Amino acid sequence: MAPPPSLAPDRGGGEPDDALRLRARAAAAAGDAPAPQQQQEQRHQEQQQQLLWYRASAPAHRRVRESPLSSDAIFRQSHAGLLNLCIVVLVAVNSRLIIENLMKYGLLIRAGFWFSGTSLADWPLLMCCLTLPTFPLAALMVEKLAQRKLISKHVVILLHIVITTSVLVYPVVVILKCDSAVLSGFVLMFLASIIWLKLVSFAHTNYDIRMLSKSIEKGVTHDISIDPENIKWPTFKRLSYFMLAPTLCYQPSYPRTTYIRKGWVVRQLIKCLVFTGLMGFIIEQYINPIVKNSKHPLKGNFLNAIERVLKLSVPTLYVWLCMFYCFFHLWLNILAELLCFGDREFYKDWWNAKTVEEYWRMWNMPVHKWVIRHIYFPCIRNGFSKGVAILISFLVSAAFHELCVAVPCHIFKFWAFIGIMFQIPLVFLTKYLQDKFNNTMVGNMIFWFFFSILGQPMCVLLYYHDVMNRQQAQTNR
């Protein structure tokens, strides 16, 4: 067996082995094959040469080389083996923690926190949820009146403002009037927020379609290529499809697939159920015991608060990743498959985000497209600077995060609002660090630390203790 080329000494004035082999192959290709005697002589020479390769006097070090983990060579190496090691260690450590938790606490699955004893009797929330589709129908009626020019442009805008405002105020009033479970209120506010975003897009897009139609009638198109499929008037069928489709941006037509993969849908539904159960297990077995044994992070000892936040960071990260996979990958793709919705870019590789700004652009594509289309670029077109447009976008996002969390919890401490607005300085900080150090890893690590290790566990502790304090105060009355 031939040694590595680095251990083979120079042959002096002789011809290298590689050259001999190349000459032999070239001669064979040309039809001038060596005679058997020549082949035997060649093999004998190779055997004699191999004896020299393993002599003690043969040099073992022949060139300058870096260690694989040195700073100059580490990024040129493949670390697949280390990644496999990390996965094995992660599985082993988490398996031990699960077994230890079950041996210490037993199975803690309960539904009291999510579904109270009155959850099935929360008929006001159920009735509110069932009546939410009336708001899209009202928006369609407004567009029909505008299409027939029975109402003016300003009246159309006013009616859409009334409809979109009502679709948020109505569920908020119902939830605050009823002492419902947290999960029931969250689901209702989540649906109401989605309908609000869709109706704003519906109204804004149709307003722009009317403006484009008037420009076409006048022969003024501003040199913009207009697809006739995207300037059609709204119909009940188009609105119904839009309200069910996994998108927040209205348009008269969407890219469609040709058929439904029924077996694929069943597999995704099974995965969705499995990961939903996993989320519930982590919450009940890990997150609830940790927060129960903690104090309010703003009232207790600082070191104890840091210890609780760090202990809570891993399970909350797992729950958040499961939630992302269940909703953005499984559920939205299931909806897209059932509706033959073609554009399924619901997220990008946000885990590789180099800055906080990149993360917000990549992790939730339906909301990102909505913000770009209906907030950011309209602000730019109206003369606002880029920084002001970003600030307004974050304000809207922070307001909806606060609504979806604070209203179901019946607590208005603005923790979610502050958490989202705190992302603005992080946007500029990570952008500055990336430009200063020309290193993509710095911003990525800052994003993971503030978002997953510090931000989410802190919000969980703050809201949990506020909810528990509110429930305790109600019990003492």
UniProtKB/Swiss-Prot annotation:
Membrane-spanning ranges: 79-99, 123-143, 155-175, 182-202, 230-250, 263-283, 319-339, 387-407, 409-429, 442-462
Record pathway: Glycerolipid metabolism; triacylglycerol biosynthesis
Short name of one Pfam family: MBOAT
Region (Disordered): 1-48
GO cellular component: chloroplast envelope; endoplasmic reticulum membrane
Membrane topology: Multi-pass membrane protein
Motif FYXDWWN motif positions after renumbering to this chain: 346-352
InterPro entries: Diacylglycerol_acylTrfase1, MBOAT_fam, Oat_ACAT_DAG_ARE
Subcellular location: Endoplasmic reticulum membrane
First-level EC class: transferase
Chain's role: Involved in triacylglycerol (TAG) synthesis. Catalyzes the acylation of the sn-3 hydroxy group of sn-1,2-diacylglycerol using acyl-CoA.
Protein name: Diacylglycerol O-acyltransferase 1-2
Organism: Oryza sativa subsp. japonica (Rice)
